[in-house]
């Protein structure tokens, strides 16, 4: 999808229309704009709790993608007989009133420009053959990529942008939560749902905006935050990048756009190619500005000493599992301290943070089996997540780690086949399904069975179950009391957790 808009994004009252509004990144932006009392509409082929939440704050949702959707706000002025639904643009005004406000230029936020065609927002997932997209071009609507809207929001705030191949969602959520608990009331836009604000976005009244900024399609270079964080850099998204050098160049450009860059020294690529203003590390790099020392790894979390430039600030409890989440918490400490927060305030917030959905999220228990949903879909993410799970077994909380993994994208599976083959060393049993295409073609002629064979060369207990629906019959036969069953992947495997749970009862 290409942006064809010329000029700045208009936040003064011109409507926004999102193509694929139910997506995790699109919906967060739509929510913030709707909460700002801007006219928001969008289309999505599926009705979900995410689209329901958007409707609850006034967005108009269409369940088809046709050019006529783009005329919605203009149509309000020619059909004044019907009242707006409660909470819709105009805050419950009749259509006559919103039409009048459009001509007079007045509403609760200043102006509604409903006489204008909307600003259309797309993500990379929308292809140029999409009928609604083609309609937007034909109607000469300004068309923006999702990242253009986020970049504009960051630019008008004191922006804090969290980048990195892994850990963006948890780190940005942690930072947002710390600032919120400290009373700074930031606006938060992240790529996962968080119970603390009951969704993937929160509109605050403060001057800060905390956002997860994405490198997957190269749009990271659009952002100019006051504070940037880079958690790590690795080759991923082989559908967009051919080499690690291409990824590094994107991050170097992002670094040049940040007033202050905070970077993790535990990543060799960050050490070699970036020059962060502020650094953090676990116990490996004593030169880091922020360090975690004396790590006590426990079944219910980790306790660490936090050091700031050679001075011990105190201890911190990280309830999220795994060393990677200690690292994510250190990034939040670094941001909080940069903003002048006292360490006890930061530590208390981190200790009470319960994480984001689909990040080691407990989905239920049955007959001594614990069911976990996790978004891990890259070999490094699998290694970190399974190491965290194994830590819980080591401390006696569970007896076995069972990894149920749905590979995500043919290109990723093909590119990282060797790395995937050794990524399951901390699992006692591995169950692999067929590959979730995410809309990709398969020029590699690769299947999940190929990955199962590769993993089987390094692991003695691998089962290939290609069809997701077959898991409902298979897993209850092999799962046993004391198992920690992890459903892993960025596709739709998580939709099988509830049926498997029910089948185990």
Curated annotation (Swiss-Prot):
It holds the Pfam family Mur_ligase. It catalyses: UDP-N-acetyl-alpha-D-muramate + L-alanine + ATP = UDP-N-acetyl-alpha-D-muramoyl-L-alanine + ADP + phosphate + H(+). The gene is murC. The keyword Ligase applies. Keywords: ATP-binding, Cell cycle, Cell division, Cell shape, Cell wall biogenesis/degradation, Cytoplasm, Ligase, Nucleotide-binding, Peptidoglycan synthesis. One of its GO terms (cellular component) is cytoplasm. This is UDP-N-acetylmuramate--L-alanine ligase. It comes from Synechocystis sp. (strain ATCC 27184 / PCC 6803 / Kazusa). Gene3D superfamilies: Mur ligase, C-terminal domain (3.90.190.20), Mur-like, catalytic domain (3.40.1190.10), NAD(P)-binding Rossmann-like Domain (3.40.50.720). Its EC number is 6.3.2.8. Pathway: Cell wall biogenesis; peptidoglycan biosynthesis.
